[in-house]
Amino acid sequence: DAMGGDHAPQEIVKGAVMALSQDKELSVVLTGDEPSVRKCLEGQAYDASRLEVVHCTEVITNDESPTLAIRSKKDSSLVVALKMLKEAEEVKGLVSAGSTGAVLTGALLRVGRIRGISRPAVCPALPTAKGGKVLIIDAGANAECKTVNLAHFANMGTAYAKTMGVKTPRV
């Protein structure tokens, strides 16, 4: 989502180019206003065969109702990115610095959730002083949680930790 965030698309594009330089197996799809994204790419050194720009005509801002924006702005950079995440075999993840509410609402409405999981959770991975990582599941995104939600968060956090190579995660 090249248009999400206070400093988009400039900082998003710079971050995408940096990620490409750090991971030679990575490919990036930037969704957003193509002329603006291309202008930000000018003068940057990157492998053009690993970066695609998909033009979108709309942007979701932090001032909008997340649900209304996701439902009405079908050609927004976030909704198009979510659609690609769900439908495009080669798209495996999504990064957005935009509205957290819109990202979570969009993920729920456009991508769906694992059967049996009642609500999504934000899960940042933080570096530790010893060089490892710690996951903080939900990170305060849900103010009103029931016991079942906390159990689901624990299950999702465990699954995420295992994808990061942790053999026996502790919650």
PLM features: what roles do these ranges have?
Residues 14, 101, 120, 124, ...:
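Residues on a specific face of well-ordered alpha-helices
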Residues 80-87, 119-127, 157-161:
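Short, charged beta->alpha transition segments
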Residues 1-108, 162-171:
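Contiguous, glycine/small-aliphatic-enriched amphipathic segments in soluble metabolic enzymes
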Residues 1-2, 110-113, 143-147:
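Acidic/glycine-enriched edge-of-secondary-structure segments
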Residues 75, 98, 116, 129, ...:
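Short, amphipathic alpha-helical segments
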Residues 93, 104-140:
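Short, acidic/small-residue loops that bind anionic groups at enzyme active sites
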